[in-house]
Amino acid sequence: MGRSFEVRKASMAKTQGAKIKVYSKYGKEIYVCAKNGGTDPDMNLSLRHLITKAKKDQVPAHVIEKALDKASGGAGEDYQPARYEGFGPGGASVIVDCLTDNGNRTYQDVRQCFVKTGAKIGTPGVVAHMFDHQAVFQFQGDDEEAILEALMMADAEVTDIEHEDGVITVFAPNTEFFKVKTALNEAFPDLTLDVEEITFVPQNRTVVSGEDAEKFQKFLDMLDDCDDVQQVYHNADIE
């Protein structure tokens, strides 16, 4: 499909404050997932995936357990999802996903990130159509034909498979995430998935350079500092 999936692995947090932010975001997401779908990872597949992802990002076990205990208690905050869309510095498309217990506060916090960097927050749907909501898996390998055959045998729907420099990337509809993951694990028991996530993959990319590149990085840093922001998706190629 002519797309390249850019893997942005966040470097390990270098300061205690940065680590706490990562732990807090995972704790909130695990709490909401467990509260809505149950605290048993064997029954709640979304929770199982989230816990696996948290462990890969070195979130301590006590943070995960605290979120599960909080969800099982039935009390706690009532977080709701909120999504904001717009154009960042340099015109790149941006989607910001949040979990909030105060929608007005979250909107103002996110809006300030846009305003202070010359970005433009838009109406719902203004850029979502420029992204594909995909399940993405990435791992070391060279035999993409064997991967495709295994997925076809499992009747798993696949959007695209890319192979570059010894790395295979599988794209599938977001609804096929667990089916594709199960098929890969069963067909290739020794396979290590470096990336396994549901994300928004941009259909096209926008080059952001010079002063706009500096502003865009500041924009991302400001969003990262917002407690309610969980994920940021964009199509910027920052130079």
Swiss-Prot record:
The keyword Lipid metabolism does not apply. PANTHER family: TRANSLATIONAL ACTIVATOR OF CYTOCHROME C OXIDASE 1. This is Probable transcriptional regulatory protein VC_A0006. HAMAP family: Transcrip_reg_TACO1. Belongs to the TACO1 family. The keyword DNA-binding applies. It is found in: Cytoplasm. GO terms for cellular component: cytosol. GO terms for biological process: regulation of DNA-templated transcription. One of its GO terms (molecular function) is DNA binding. Pfam families: TACO1_YebC_N (PF20772), Transcrip_reg (PF01709). Its main location: cytoplasm. Keywords: Cytoplasm, DNA-binding, Transcription, Transcription regulation. InterPro entries: Integrase-like_N (IPR017856), TACO1_YebC-like_2nd/3rd_dom (IPR048300), TACO1_YebC_N (IPR049083), Transcrip_reg_TACO1-like (IPR002876), Transcrip_reg_TACO1-like_dom3 (IPR026564), YebC-like (IPR029072). Signal peptide: none annotated. It comes from Vibrio cholerae serotype O1 (strain ATCC 39315 / El Tor Inaba N16961).
